[in-house]
UniProtKB/Swiss-Prot annotation:
Source organism: Homo sapiens (Human)
Keyword Cell inner membrane: no
Biological-process GO terms, alphabetical: isocitrate metabolic process; tricarboxylic acid cycle
Lineage: Eukaryota, Metazoa, Chordata, Craniata, Vertebrata
Regulation of activity: The heterotetramer and the heterodimer composed of IDH3A and IDH3G subunits can be allosterically activated by citrate (CIT) or/and ADP, and the two activators can act independently or synergistically. The heterodimer composed of IDH3A and IDH3B subunits cannot be allosterically regulated and the allosteric regulation of the heterotetramer is through the IDH3G subunit and not the IDH3B subunit.
Transit peptide: 1-34
Name of the protein in question: Isocitrate dehydrogenase [NAD] subunit beta, mitochondrial
């Protein structure tokens, strides 16, 4: 236990040094790569970096199995603390939610699957997924939509980032029946949170060397709510004169993404729009199975798939695509300053796709999840030091 405690301290020290604020560590270097390898060797002696794992519903457990198998083969110095929370498998309760929150607050870093939200109203409007994000204040969801070399789609060589505010908006769980047959749903937009996500987007663009931020809105109709969001983005944009700033109405944005997605660089938007655009953009490069995502607060980082789908119809069929989850796991390792292991895993996944011999059904192939995992591990083993 003393050794594990020491590792927890080391984890936080490394994350703090590289990431002042959970979402700030956005750059890497050759020196960091070498340091990662050295740190990993030291940590293996004492223990491992503790990370909370929440498999979720649908194919989530199968995807997490893929992560664990690849991490084991790559000798990644991470210890997963696994918890289970599900509203559809009768595995959800206040006690379980608090256990998950406690683990995530202790470890600061988590990797999660999709927690499926039932459509039936059972007395609680806020899903466990939403409550988890609110309690950790995971205000920024980041989805990097990038084409995978070797996998041809209608649009190739895409590289854009979608940043979504995910603690308010239409996901505020404020609904009521004002009269029989009349439901009112409240959308909450605040200046503080709109400014915060706008600043996050411009900081991200600056640190990643990106040249443009597009604010997506519907201020022509929701003049006060989206008007406030747009105003905050415009105010923040003035503080970043080197970053080009544009605005676009959400419906036009959907059309432009399909017709000419190359015009976009970084997009920032309120909650519901981000959920829709995440999925639309994922479809441009191969679908939900290939796009990684992550969510940040000032203190915590959670890694997940970019398009959140439980894919329940595939459970137990060994056909789920682990690409998105493995790339997300690679991003998690980079966040922990384990650059060596992060690059090793990402390179192996991309090599499997580029070679093209092993592809799951969603990518037009006939390979199983197990086939894909074995192929990734095989490319790990043949990777040079």
């Amino acid at each position: 236990m003393a050794a594990l405690s020491g590792v927890r301290w080391l984890t936080r020290a490394l994350v703090s040094a590289g990431n002042p604020g959970a979402w700030r560590g956005l750059s890497t270097s050759a020196a960091a790569h070498a340091a990662s390898r050295s740190q990993a060797e030291d940590v293996r002696v004492e223990g491992s970096f503790p990370v909370t794992m929440l498999p979720g519903d649908g194919v989530g457990p199968e995807l997490m199995h893929a992560v664990k198998e690849v991490f084991k083969a790559a000798a990644v110095p991470v210890e997963f603390q696994e918890h289970h929370l599900s509203e559809v498998q009768n595995m959800a309760s206040e006690e379980k939610l608090e256990q998950v929150l406690s683990s995530m607050k202790e470890n600061k870093v988590a990797i999660i699957g999709k927690i499926h939200t039932p459509m039936e109203y059972k007395g609680e409007l806020a899903s466990y997924d939403m409550r988890l994000r609110r309690k950790l204040d995971l205000f920024a969801n980041v989805v990097h939509v990038k084409s995978l070399p070797g996998y041809m789609t209608r649009h190739n060589n895409l590289d854009l980032v979608i940043i979504r505010e995910q603690t308010e908006g239409e996901y505020s769980s404020l609904e009521h029946e004002s009269a029989r047959g009349v439901i009112e749903c409240l959308k909450i937009v605040t200046r503080a949170k709109s400014q915060r996500i706008a600043k996050f987007a411009f900081d991200y663009a600056t640190k990643k060397g990106r040249g443009k931020v597009t604010a997506v809105h519907k201020a022509n109709i929701m003049k006060l709510g989206d008007g406030l969001f747009l105003q905050c983005c415009e105010e923040v944009a003035e503080l970043y004169p080197k970053i080009k700033f544009e605005t676009m109405i959400i419906d036009n944005c959907c059309m432009q993404l399909v017709q000419n997605p190359y015009q976009f660089d970084v997009l920032v938007m309120p909650n519901l729009y981000g959920n829709i655009i995440d999925n639309l953009a994922a479809g441009l490069v191969g679908g939900a199975g290939v796009v990684p995502g992550e969510s940040y607060s000032a203190e915590y980082a959670v890694f997940e798939t970019g398009a959140r789908h439980p894919f329940a119809q595939a459970v137990g069929r060994n056909i789920a695509n682990p690409t998105a989850m493995l790339l997300s796991a690679s991003n998690m390792l980079r966040h922990l300053n384990l650059e060596y292991h992060s690059s090793m895993i990402a390179d192996a996944v991309k090599k499997v796709i580029k070679v093209g011999k092993v592809r799951t059904r969603d990518m037009g192939g006939y390979s199983t999840t197990t086939d894909f995992i074995k192929s990734v591990i095989g490319h790990l083993q043949t990777k040079g030091s």
